[in-house]
Amino acid sequence: MADLEEQLSDEEKVRIAAKFIIHAPPGEFNEVFNDVRLLLNNDNLLREGAAHAFAQYNLDQFTPVKIEGYEDQVLITEHGDLGNGKFLDPKNRICFKFDHLRKEATDPRPYEAENAVESWRTSVETALRAYVKEHYPNGVCTVYGKKIDGQQTIIACIESHQFQAKNFWNGRWRSEWKFTITPSTTQVVGILKIQVHYYEDGNVQLVSHKDIQDSLTVSNEVQTAREFIKIVEAAENEYQTAISENYQTMSDTTFKALRRQLPVTRTKIDWNKILSYKIGKEMQNA
């Protein structure tokens, strides 16, 4: 191990550490960071060299953050990234600094976003918040309105997590929806992601995603928002049901084909009575 460490440059060590951090399971960033910190044994190198990994993790995971003085949490996403460590809260029309390591928001200030699309953004956000409240016990959503390639675009992000470290599991749901505001009809594009880590009796991760495409009728802001939510709800319900059914089927078939739950005798060995078994007697007489 010592020879391997001598062969690795600082750049290679940081690259490996960054990979560990970016792939940390939901809710386990601190544990992975602390382990990597011990392995690297160089805090300055880790902070400077792997800072991009801290940021990438939060962007990928849609990390929710509470801003002091404001009621609702906002998601850290690439769509709200203003550069130089600043992020947008479109609902409250503010920008703020975000510490990717501490996961803290500071220095909130007024910020004027795209006014041309604001009425559409607000309508979608109102409808989406009602939907999230109904379907996600710990859900957070952020809706952005911006011009992309000259087109007015709505981007809706949803995050919901359950961190149950005491019960040895953590999980996160993320979904991102996007459509442009064009006359008559437009295309809705979405991606749904689930990541769950279970580590009580082993180390199992579920990492799944699904791409969605559907057409949306564009009329006024409120009606379009309602139709958009119908698409979101139908797709997310279908995805959740498919995941549940798939893993129930896998439990009933694939897992059982890989390993017997009981020995061939169909009974579990009582290790306290091992001497009463033939093998126990043979061992005793040996």
UniProtKB/Swiss-Prot annotation:
Pfam families: F-actin_cap_A
Keywords associated with the record: Acetylation, Actin capping, Actin-binding, Phosphoprotein
GO CC list: brush border; cortical cytoskeleton; F-actin capping protein complex; membrane
Gene3D superfamilies: F-actin capping protein, alpha subunit, F-actin capping protein, beta subunit
Subunit: Component of the F-actin capping complex, composed of a heterodimer of an alpha and a beta subunit. Component of the WASH complex, composed of F-actin-capping protein subunit alpha (CAPZA1, CAPZA2 or CAPZA3), F-actin-capping protein subunit beta (CAPZB), WASHC1, WASHC2, WASHC3, WASHC4 and WASHC5. Interacts with RCSD1/CAPZIP.
Biological role: F-actin-capping proteins bind in a Ca(2+)-independent manner to the fast growing ends of actin filaments (barbed end) thereby blocking the exchange of subunits at these ends. Unlike other capping proteins (such as gelsolin and severin), these proteins do not sever actin filaments.
Family that this chain belongs to: Belongs to the F-actin-capping protein alpha subunit family.
Protein name: F-actin-capping protein subunit alpha-2
UniProt organism field: Otolemur garnettii (Small-eared galago)
Lineage: Eukaryota, Metazoa, Chordata, Craniata, Vertebrata
